[in-house]
Amino acid sequence: DSGGLTPPHADCVPGKXQXNGNYGAVPNKKQQ
C-alpha cells in the first residue's frame, strides 16, 4: 500500500469501515 486511500473492499461497508489493502475492514481513520 502507498499509505493513501484504497478502494472499498467487499468486506468493507461504506460509512462503517474502510478497506486497507488486504488488512480487511479497518476503522475510518487516517492511519499512515
Swiss-Prot record:
It comes from the Eukaryota. Keywords: Allergen, IgE-binding protein, IgG-binding protein. Disulfide bonds: none annotated. One of its GO terms (molecular function) is IgE binding. The keyword Calcium does not apply. Residues 1-32 are annotated as: Disordered. The keyword Transmembrane does not apply. This is Allergen Asp fl 3. It comes from Aspergillus flavus. The lineage of its organism: Eukaryota, Fungi, Dikarya, Ascomycota, Pezizomycotina.
